[in-house]
């Protein structure tokens, strides 16, 4: 069966045909490293990890680029607020610290490292080159107020709106720059002139004046720098479709680059039936999620829904994932013990070293726009059949089904017996630690409400000495283990 993917630009399922036979180039919008990672970031990264693993299983050589937006208004603003509160952290130090938090969270979930992970600040020259081309082609203009701002001229590009199928007249005003020198409210910033009071380290020289890049131009530059002017797949969260991806597509095509051939968008996360957002105060941070269950359980949960659907998080979600994974783990353990010492002990390896074959039904599900829920159904059917074979004493059938299960969990990155998960499998100890830490956090909150700040600070210090970091936010206090 041919792999088919849902292309957001055409709003249809399309047969996937690589630009270069046997090779695939994927660009995924990575995080803006302004604050700690949350469940939405993890869900998005995992969706494209599943895609990458499936393409690799099919024998394709995959190059995956996931960027880091380390220069942005939000990064600068968060650093400034920290300094106003008495901190000393510069914007670039904040960005690097948060970037490491993302890297640790991705690694904990078994998300494969990208082939390239460029920072925006390392591609300033490439961004300026695209802007120069746009100005020369009549699709961008420098503000005439000497601010140093450069804008994309949306009126000059008739195809603007093609990704989201919007008419220009119906689009909302671009909110990424000061509108004072725009020709049209929909014009968006390609280059932002330096403003009084901003750190000098957040500006670079340019033909239009000292400043920094706009958000959208960053991804156009980094994707084409590492994948070429035309590449296979551009991915990201559904919330990035407009304006970010719409603007990326317009400026790249207007600059003369064919750009991405397929556009994929993963769904968002709902918490207790509500869309997760900072404004609602219901953000679920990665550290809290990873502290509440084994990382392989979290991975199972995050990857269990179809990548385009909304992922529903509720109180029993991780317990359900734990139970499902336990069934797989129990069968793999049980079958390993029963088959030990028999002629069915080891699954035959492919003579050419290729990945173990998966059942046809599993492959058909994955080829159908990565239908992981259907693939998991095939996996659990195999587990049930394998247990039945063991009960009946049919070791040959049990061994065959065990090989199928092992191949499927390997493709999905959820093999509970893999070495990468063994270091985090001490669930009783984790539960005990979580209960103790949350009890101390509750005591600290009570002290703060009673304005006993000395006690609150002492509790925080005691936890810090034990290797526990507390992060306060409007939604409450969150904790993580130093180095994890």
UniProtKB/Swiss-Prot annotation:
Cofactor: how bound: Binds 1 zinc ion per subunit.
Coiled-coil positions: none
Keyword Cytoplasm (UniProt): yes
Enzyme class, first EC level, given as a word: ligase
Stored PANTHER family: CYSTEINE--TRNA LIGASE, CYSTEINYL-TRNA SYNTHETASE
Keyword ATP-binding: yes
Name of the protein in its database record: Cysteine--tRNA ligase
Gene Ontology CC: cytosol
InterPro entries (alphabetical): Cys-tRNA-ligase, Cys-tRNA-synt_Ia_DALR, Cys-tRNA/MSH_ligase, CysS_C, Rossmann-like_a/b/a_fold, tRNA-synt_1_cat_dom, tRNAsynth_Ia_anticodon-bd
Species whose genome carries this gene: Clavibacter michiganensis subsp. michiganensis (strain NCPPB 382)
Xref: HAMAP family: Cys_tRNA_synth
Binding of Zn(2+), residues: 29, 219, 244, 248
GO BP, sorted A to Z: cysteinyl-tRNA aminoacylation
Motif ('HIGH' region) on chain: 31-41
GO molecular function list: ATP binding; cysteine-tRNA ligase activity; zinc ion binding
Primary localization: cytoplasm
Xref: SUPFAM superfamilies: Anticodon-binding domain of a subclass of class I aminoacyl-tRNA synthetases, Nucleotidylyl transferase
Required co-factors: Zn(2+)
Cellular compartments annotated: Cytoplasm
Disulfide bonds: none
Keywords: Aminoacyl-tRNA synthetase, ATP-binding, Cytoplasm, Ligase, Metal-binding, Nucleotide-binding, Protein biosynthesis, Zinc
Entry's transmembrane regions: none
Enzyme Commission number: 6.1.1.16
Residues bound to ATP: 278
Reactions this protein catalyses: tRNA(Cys) + L-cysteine + ATP = L-cysteinyl-tRNA(Cys) + AMP + diphosphate
Quaternary structure note: Monomer.
Gene3D superfamilies per record: Cysteine-tRNA ligase, C-terminal anti-codon recognition domain, HUPs
């Amino acid at each position: 069966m041919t792999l088919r993917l849902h292309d957001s630009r055409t709003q249809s399922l399309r047969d996937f045909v690589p630009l270069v036979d046997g090779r695939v180039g994927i660009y995924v919008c990575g995080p803006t490293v302004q604050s700690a990672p949350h469940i939405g970031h993890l869900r998005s990264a995992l969706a494209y990890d599943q895609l990458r693993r499936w393409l690799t299983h099919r024998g394709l050589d995959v190059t995956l680029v996931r960027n880091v937006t380390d220069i942005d208004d939000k990064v600068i603003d968060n650093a400034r607020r920290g300094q106003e509160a008495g901190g000393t952290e510069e914007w670039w130090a904040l960005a690097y610290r948060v970037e490491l938090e993302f890297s640790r969270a991705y690694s904990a979930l078994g998300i494969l490292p990208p082939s390239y992970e460029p920072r925006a600040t390392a591609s300033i020259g490439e961004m300026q080159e695209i802007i120069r081309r746009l100005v020369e082609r009549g699709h961008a203009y420098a503000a005439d107020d000497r601010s140093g701002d450069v804008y994309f001229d949306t009126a000059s590009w008739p195809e603007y709106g093609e990704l989201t199928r919007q008419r220009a007249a119906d689009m909302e005003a671009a909110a990424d720059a000061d509108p004072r020198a725009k020709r049209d409210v929909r014009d968006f910033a390609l280059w932002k002139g330096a403003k009084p009071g901003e750190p000098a380290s957040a500006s670079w020289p340019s033909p239009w004046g000292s400043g920094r890049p706009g958000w959208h131009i960053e991804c156009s530059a980094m994707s084409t720098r590492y994948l070429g002017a035309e590449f296979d797949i551009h991915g990201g969260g559904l919330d990035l479709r407009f304006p970010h991806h719409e603007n990326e597509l317009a400026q790249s095509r207007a600059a003369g680059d064919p750009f991405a051939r397929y556009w994929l968008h993963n769904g968002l996360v709902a918490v207790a039936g509500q869309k997760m957002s900072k404004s609602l105060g219901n953000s679920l941070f990665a550290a809290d999620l990873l502290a509440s269950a084994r990382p392989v359980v979290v991975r199972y949960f995050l990857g269990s829904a179809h990548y385009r659907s909304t992922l529903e998080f509720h109180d029993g979600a991780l317990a359900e994932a734990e139970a499902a994974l336990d069934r797989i783990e129990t069968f793999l353990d049980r079958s390993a013990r029963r088959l030990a010492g028999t002629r069915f002990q080891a699954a035959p390896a492919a003579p050419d070293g290729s990945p173990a074959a998966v059942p046809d039904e599993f492959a058909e599900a994955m080829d159908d726009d990565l239908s992981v829920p259907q693939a998991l159904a095939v996996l659990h059917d195999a587990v049930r059949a394998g247990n039945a074979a063991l009960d009946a004493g049919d070791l040959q059938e049990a061994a065959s089904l065990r090989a199928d299960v092992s191949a499927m969990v390997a493709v999905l990155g959820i093999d509970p017996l893999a070495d990468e998960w063994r270091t985090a499998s001490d669930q009783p100890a984790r539960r005990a630690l979580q209960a103790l830490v949350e009890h101390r956090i509750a005591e600290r909150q009570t002290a703060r409400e009673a304005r006993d700040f000395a006690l609150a600070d002492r509790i925080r210090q005691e936890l810090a000495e034990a290797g526990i970091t507390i992060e306060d936010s409007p939604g409450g206090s969150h904790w993580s283990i130093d180095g994890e």
